[in-house]
Amino acid sequence: MKWVVSFFLLFLLNFSDSRTMHKNAYGIDSILDSSPCSSGTNLVGLATIFFAQSVQGATYEEVSQMVKDVLTIIEKPTGSKQPAGCLENQVSAFLEEICREKEIPEKYGLSDCCSRTGEERHDCFLAHKKAAPASIPPFPVLEPVTSCKSYKENRELFINRYIYEIARRHPVLYAPTILSVANQYNKIIPHCCKAENATECFETKVTSITKELRESSLLNQHICAVMGKFGPRTFRAITVTKVSQKFPKANFTEIQKLVMDVAHIHEECCKGNVLECLQDGERVMSYICSQQDILSRQIAECCKLPTTLELGHCIIHAENDDKPEGLSPNVNRFLGDRDFNQLSSRDKDLSMARFTYEYSRRHTKLAVPIILRVAKGYQELLEKCSQSENPSECQDKGEEELEKYIQESQALAKRSCGLFQKLGEYYLQNAFLVAYTKKAPQLTSPELMALTRKMANAGAICCHLSEDKQLACGEGVADLIIGHLCIRHEENPINPGVDQCCTSSYSNRRPCFSSLVVDETYVPPPFSDDKFIFHKDLCQVQGVPLQTMKQQFLINLVKQKPQITEEQLETVVADFSGLLEKCCQSQEQEVCFTEEGPALISKTRAALGV
């Protein structure tokens, strides 16, 4: 499962102090420089992405005009020492272009943002981005004859329009990913236009691109939401874990350097600073390739690729390198005789970063949240042992207990895969449906179905892997699914239990949701017979439509009585299945449902006490 779609990202530049830090708190030099220039980059494409993501409802013509106007400013010589293409604050210039005339802000509901200045204006525009606005129609279907003709007449215009269509539908998607996908699209158009069956060629090729877009967009939303909710400290811990697993042979100083810059790049990406993120990502990738001898043997082929976009994609998806030889299996007595509680806040953070590095490079196949749970447990252990009479003995005993975090996740993975093998994907989804309707009955039926479909699909993917990969796969997918449930909660609060799980601790989100049982604050709606009356149309549908109808019934039932026991549920489902079988075999199907249905509803209400 992809965790970080790219180390290189978006394109606005230099929002006030974004380039001022070239060393971290421990004096480690940054790989990045402070050049605010845009020479050699696809500024038209980047500016199109920015305006389409910031003003999602704008037409292509409106976006193109804003691009033209702002590039005139950027590419004009300033008269200072900076050459054309250099601008100290490109973010401000781009936002000013949107706000320059009243027509665009008023037309698209951005007047409030334009009434603000500086970072407040920037934050307002970011808050207006919507993942799936109802005002934007579905992605236009590619019609081979028209598309091939348009591409041949003006290739640059055709591709830039494609960039616009992607960006407005995916407002948090990193610009380099959009440019990379547009580059893939640019390659398949001439190929498919010459194909014997152009329609089939386009359908096949575009499907894979669409899948990549969807996954990347969801991932970028997740990353930015985690950074926004839990702050830079948590995000740096995530990055330490991931980079240490990717490059376990690298020393701690090298990891610190990469973590500092990668975290900075993601921060700029999530702000929408496209040019800086794009250029900084290229610099980081170039640096990684220049240091491959000390970082990883797995990236040699990646570093031979012709473009930075291809190179970056390859490095991110490369296998983690092998652990160094002679590395002890455990991180025992990490602090030696030092008293953790006597350390300064800075030294505590540094010590925990080093522990996370050492633990991650020894456990390159564990999911990031599991390692962070171990690190959190280790810090709690150190704090507790500092108060004991024999800190060293306390620490030795406590380190064995850290395995419980791995064992809990292993037990869950084993149990989930056991259910998948026993039930199959559809019935596994039904089990998740019951559980999550109890945890979050405020979610709509489509939301519950979509959520649990992803969970069941994760079982289908992860449970077919080798046992040593199932755990990381399952935890990784669960982290993303729960992350998007938390984004939904942020937009429209669900209930106190969900809020507690989403906000208290990033690393503990999945265990928190696993421990939720029933939302005790939920008050079921008055019972409605209409939700439980069946008609003969149920006898005429098959496959997915029939499964969906049954799942809707299941959701309605649990929402009516969230405390329903497994035995009660099995009885009610069996009774209604019997009704379906009886009436669908009857010559008078509708009459059967009309006569038998109400009696069964009464029986069910009495049994459940609703």
Swiss-Prot record:
Glycosylation-annotated residues: N197, N251
Keywords: Copper, Disulfide bond, Glycoprotein, Metal-binding, Nickel, Phosphoprotein, Repeat, Secreted, Signal, Sulfation
Matches recorded under InterPro entries: ALB/AFP/VDB (IPR000264), Serum_albumin-like (IPR020858), Serum_albumin/AFP/Afamin (IPR021177), Serum_albumin_CS (IPR020857), Serum_albumin_N (IPR014760)
Domain of life: Eukaryota
PANTHER family: ALPHA-FETOPROTEIN, SERUM ALBUMIN-RELATED
Protein name: Alpha-fetoprotein
Gene3D superfamilies tied to this protein: 1.10.246.10
Major localization listed first in the record, in broad terms: secreted
Signal peptide: 1-18
Entry comment on modification after translation: Sulfated.
Occurrences of domain Albumin (ranges): 19-210, 211-403, 404-602
GO MF assignments: metal ion binding
Modification sites for Phosphoserine: S111, S115, S345, S445
Sites where the protein binds Cu(2+): H22
Recorded GO CC terms: cytoplasm; extracellular space
Paired cysteines (S-S): C99-C114, C113-C124, C148-C193, C192-C201, C224-C270, C269-C277, C289-C303, C302-C314, C385-C394, C417-C463, C462-C473, C486-C502, C501-C512, C539-C584, C583-C592
Tissue expression per record: Plasma.
Subunit structure: Dimeric and trimeric forms have been found in addition to the monomeric form.
Pfam entry (one): Serum_albumin
